[in-house]
């Protein structure tokens, strides 16, 4: 039997399973690495030749629960909620 159509029916073992970090079915069972995000490496896997993939998973594509408000707080000088001391006017 060759490596073509007849042999494809005999393939039934999964080489990839779900990844804990990205949730895709890209975690290689034997290598123990994710082909999509690079888990368990500390840094996320990203390549310049995959610009579309970068765009899909970059900052701003999720909830941004904290970052959403940083620009507004920056404009106001990161106020802490404590009133400024009154300076006597001349």
UniProtKB/Swiss-Prot annotation:
Keyword list, A-Z: Cytoplasm, Metal-binding, Ribonucleoprotein, Ribosomal protein, RNA-binding, rRNA-binding, Zinc, Zinc-finger
* Record keyword Transit peptide present: no
**Top-rank taxon, per record:** Eukaryota
Where does this one sit in the cell?
A: Cytoplasm
Matches recorded under InterPro entries: Ribosomal_eL37, Ribosomal_eL37/eL43, Ribosomal_eL37_CS, Ribosomal_zn-bd
**Primary role:** Component of the ribosome, a large ribonucleoprotein complex responsible for the synthesis of proteins in the cell. The small ribosomal subunit (SSU) binds messenger RNAs (mRNAs) and translates the encoded message by selecting cognate aminoacyl-transfer RNA (tRNA) molecules. The large subunit (LSU) contains the ribosomal catalytic site termed the peptidyl transferase center (PTC), which catalyzes the formation of peptide bonds, thereby polymerizing the amino acids delivered by tRNAs into a polypeptide chain.
Q: What is this protein called?
A: Large ribosomal subunit protein eL37
Q: Could you tell me which species this protein originates from?
A: Candida albicans (strain SC5314 / ATCC MYA-2876) (Yeast)
Question: Source taxonomy lineage?
Answer: Eukaryota, Fungi, Dikarya, Ascomycota, Saccharomycotina
> Gene that codes for this?
RPL37B
